[in-house]
Amino acid sequence: MSALPPTALALAEQLIARASVTPEDAGCQALVVQRLQAQGFDCHTLESGPDDFRVTNLWAVRRGRSADGFTLVFAGHTDVVPTGPLERWTSDPFVPSHRDGRLYGRGAADMKTSIACMVVAIEEFVAAYPRHAGSIALLLTSDEEGPALDGTTQVVRWLQARGERLDGCIVGEPTSVNAVGDMIKNGRRGSLSGRLVVQGVQGHIAYPHLAKNPIHAVAPALAELVQVVWDGGNEHFPPTSWQVSNLHAGTGASNVIPGEAVVDFNFRFSTESTPETLQQRLAAVLDRHGLQYTIDWTLGGRPFLTRPGSLTEALGSAILQVTGRTTELSTTGGTSDGRFIATVCPQVVECGPVNASIHQIDEHVAVAEIEPLKEIYRSTLERLVA
């Protein structure tokens, strides 16, 4: 077995230096595989997707001595969002840079630092507990920031086919608000999107009696939908939200009544609602307004919730030990790959660095919070797997 590894900071810098914009992995997972194989991990690289959007996935596992031991999975993504205008960055987004006690680079917060902390925590844990009772696994994908069709969801199907048992999973999403460990996510709302196409009759704007304006037709329905209380939420989730993201209509000419209007919208829904009930209720409003329409629905993910149990207790205790903070359980924010893992794993929790700069110009993490995050992951391993 190799000697103790370099710091999580050094590994984070190596990962940031790889320009892995979705769906590219740019060698990030190969670097991780090299390190984990040295620790006795069985590594499987799984590629999927069409030729013009090839996704790289990784499943790595180190079995424990006990068949009944706790299997803890660390999950993350090696892909990052595009940089945006390079001229607005203070330094090259794919050259890790240090300023004011911060590590800068695309993926620094979301989520290459988390991956580095996971890997080094695993290495240190295996060195200290080479005959650990439970099992340790790592799941990585290069398709989380994109359509997420060929990433974690494909690995989950593969795991199901193999009959793998997972007991708990920590997703390294940047969940912290002001300081590392102050908030973790024990669930996420569901996401249901729709594209509504309302049919009208195109015509000259001076002869409205010979046309049918779809904008005028849909406007009262939209006004009603904005006012609907879809549910009241519950102790774990805020009320379901319905938001319009895009409106499209018109030919660009100022004297033409359009023939159709397109409305893109999204539900972020709690466990008090289902995709089916939301679809039915929205259609009822549209029908009541007498619209001629079609809707294409896309279910991004159903809500999931991990109630307090062995994983939240171990992670919360680790955070308290390392930082002195009592963490807050939350389900706010967007979706993550936790929604896919939750279909095969009874306990899924997200824990990572401060999220204030994610997806932004000059993305960064505080260097002083990298080692504590690694220690949180290692302490959780000790509590569940040793």
Swiss-Prot record:
Binds 2 Zn(2+) or Co(2+) ions per subunit. Pfam families: M20_dimer, Peptidase_M20. Its EC number is 3.5.1.18. The keyword Amino-acid biosynthesis applies. CDD domains: M20_DapE_proteobac (cd03891). It catalyses: N-succinyl-(2S,6S)-2,6-diaminopimelate + H2O = (2S,6S)-2,6-diaminopimelate + succinate. Zn(2+) 2 binds at D110, E145, H359. InterPro entries: Bact_exopeptidase_dim_dom, DapE_proteobac, Peptidase_M20, Peptidase_M20_dimer, Peptidase_M20A. The active site is at D79, E144 (proton acceptor). Pathway: Amino-acid biosynthesis; L-lysine biosynthesis via DAP pathway; LL-2,6-diaminopimelate from (S)-tetrahydrodipicolinate (succinylase route): step 3/3. Zn(2+) 1 binds at H77, D110, E173. Its cofactor is Zn(2+); Co(2+). Keywords: Amino-acid biosynthesis, Cobalt, Diaminopimelate biosynthesis, Hydrolase, Lysine biosynthesis, Metal-binding, Zinc. GO terms for molecular function: acetylornithine deacetylase activity; cobalt ion binding; succinyl-diaminopimelate desuccinylase activity; zinc ion binding. One of its GO terms (biological process) is diaminopimelate biosynthetic process. It comes from the Bacteria. NCBIfam families: dapE_proteo, PRK13009.1. Catalyzes the hydrolysis of N-succinyl-L,L-diaminopimelic acid (SDAP), forming succinate and LL-2,6-diaminopimelate (DAP), an intermediate involved in the bacterial biosynthesis of lysine and meso-diaminopimelic acid, an essential component of bacterial cell walls. Belongs to the peptidase M20A family. DapE subfamily. Homodimer. HAMAP family: DapE. This is Succinyl-diaminopimelate desuccinylase. The gene is dapE.
